[in-house]
Every structure is written in structure tokens, then in C-alpha cells.
Amino acid sequence: MSVNDLRPGTTFIYEGNLFVVIEQSFSKTGRQQGKVSVKAKNLRTGSRVEITFTGGEKVEKAMIERKDMQYLYNDGTDAYLMDTDTYEQIQIPMTRLEWESKFLTDGLMIKMTEYDGEVLGISLPDKVELEVTEAEAAVKGDTTSGALKKAVVETGLDIMVPLFVNVGTKVIISTTDGKYSGRAQ
């Protein structure tokens, strides 16, 4: 595919590495051939790079596959996922899921991204429901609006919650920033 066709979200292979386009811009000066500048994320390492191509240059388009998976459990080293269509189980090293592991509970439905049989990562739902396992006691008389206290949820994530949240309360947590979003119904 031509680099002129690169758009945000497009995946491509360049110098043996797998990238997804974050931003793209085209510039042309005078008689020179146009240049395409691309800010891209390396899908294997997570690093972000800026690549400048000469207009008309070619790159290989990468076909990324996204599958619905169910998180089963982790054994401390690997996380185990199950394909909900084929019931095939896949394991991913926990080191590749440092942020995501803070929100994974048994049975959680997620999306797994893979390329040519290689697992690149997982995508979590925007919000997850977790149970509070530890919470500081609310200070009597502390009625300041918006007052918060520390709490720990079932996955070990430390969060700040309103004073009315106690141990055993199910709360909704945003997976983008790890913050309290509300009380579960």
C-alpha cells in the first residue's frame, strides 16, 4: 500500500516492525516530491516513533485480527484466556499485561489483538465492576462534599472512593485511568 493511504488506525509493517498510525500529515514544498510524516506506535514494544516517508513509497499493510475472549485466571506468571467461539485457551505472560491485570476478574469479556498468530495485547471494557476488599473507616463528622478515602478492590488496585463506600460494596472503575466511576447497582 502507498504511504499516502496511511490514516490513523491503519496497521502496517515497516523495516520488519508492526505499527499502527496515530497521526499522519502530508507536506509538499515547491518542486520536491511530497513527504508523509507518520506518528506511529510499535505494536510489539509499545514505543512511539515518528517516521517520514517520501510520497509514493510503499509499505506492507498488516491484517490485525481482534477476537472476543474470556479471561479465565492467572497463575502468577501467565494469564489464561479462552476464545468464546472455539473454546481454545491461550496464555499471555503477565508482564505484557501490567496495567490490564489491575482490572481482570474471572469471566471478564475482553478483546484480544493478534497478528499472524502472535498475541499483541488485550483491550478491556471502558469500565469494570469490582468489589471493595479493604476500606479506611470514614471519619465521624467529616461531611465535606466530595470527601474521599482510600480503598483496595479485589484485584489489588488502590483507589480513592467516597466516604459511603465500605468493604463488600461493588464499585465501577474506569479502565483508562483506574479511578472510581460510581457504585454498581
Swiss-Prot record:
Question: Which SUPFAM superfamilies did the record assign?
Answer: Nucleic acid-binding proteins, Translation proteins SH3-like domain
Where is it located?
Answer: Cytoplasm
Instruction: Provide the primary localization.
Output: cytoplasm
Entry's Gene3D superfamilies? Answer: 2.30.30.30, Nucleic acid-binding proteins
Molecular-function GO terms, alphabetical: translation elongation factor activity
- Which SMART domains does the entry link to? EFP, Elong-fact-P_C
Pfam entry (one) = EFP_N
What InterPro entries has UniProt attached to this entry? Answer: Elong-fact-P_C (IPR015365), NA-bd_OB-fold (IPR012340), Rib_uL2_dom2 (IPR014722), Transl_elong_fac_P/YeiP (IPR020599), Transl_elong_KOW-like (IPR013185), Transl_elong_P/YeiP_cen (IPR001059), Transl_elong_P/YeiP_CS (IPR013852), Transl_elongation_fac_P (IPR011768)
UniProt pathway: Protein biosynthesis; polypeptide chain elongation
According to its UniProt entry, the protein's GO biological process terms are: peptide biosynthetic process
Kindly list the GO CC terms recorded for this protein.
Answer: cytoplasm
Q: Which organism is it from?
A: Mesoplasma florum (strain ATCC 33453 / NBRC 100688 / NCTC 11704 / L1) (Acholeplasma florum)
Superkingdom of the source species: Bacteria
Q: Report what the protein is called.
A: Elongation factor P
Q: Which UniProt keywords apply?
A: Cytoplasm, Elongation factor, Protein biosynthesis
What is this protein's function? Involved in peptide bond synthesis. Stimulates efficient translation and peptide-bond synthesis on native or reconstituted 70S ribosomes in vitro. Probably functions indirectly by altering the affinity of the ribosome for aminoacyl-tRNA, thus increasing their reactivity as acceptors for peptidyl transferase.
Q: Which family does it belong to?
A: Belongs to the elongation factor P family.
